[in-house]
Regions:
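Terminal amphipathic alpha-helical/low-complexity segments used for targeting or macromolecular assembly
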Residues: 1-83
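Structural signal for interior beta-strand "rungs" in well-ordered beta-sheet cores
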Residues: 82, 86-132
Length: 132
């Protein structure tokens, strides 16, 4: 991606605030536009965007509630690393729209931002920051 394509991608991306919510319901509740996973009687784990989850939480009562969230109005999600043919250590941060070459090594604490290209067999050391 060139600089203009990156700017346009960020500008037009839907901004999201993903949350994971653990709830113990007093009465059954549905979370529209969210993924719900039962976790026992009256308990569930909910994945969704804050704009969809917040109204449900405000308009219902729960016995217990815990919310996890790690970003706000984020334009670029993290890279799905499951099928990347490289070694990526815990704590490395890779955004979508990066290219990671075969057998590359990304050490913990490295940050690989949108548009960056890491060549085949390349090692990115701890604390390195690469951008496109």
């Amino acid at each position: 991606m060139n600089a203009q394509e990156i700017i346009e991608y960020i500008r037009t991306s839907e901004k999201k605030t993903p949350v994971k919510v653990y709830v113990w319901e007093k009465t059954p509740v549905t979370f529209p536009n969210c993924r719900e996973f039962p976790a026992g009687e009256g308990c569930k784990i909910v994945f969704g965007d804050w704009k969809d989850v917040k109204p449900v939480l405000e308009n219902n009562e729960f016995s217990h509630l815990e919310i996890e969230n790690d970003c706000r109005n984020s334009a670029i999600p993290l890279l799905d690393m499951k099928d990347i043919p490289a070694r990526i250590e815990p704590g490395a941060i890779l955004r979508e729209q990066v290219e990671i070459g075969k057998n590359a090594v990304i050490m913990m604490g490295a940050v690989i931002n949108i548009g960056a290209i890491v060549g085949e067999g390349t090692m990115i050391d701890m604390g390195a920051v690469l951008g496109g």
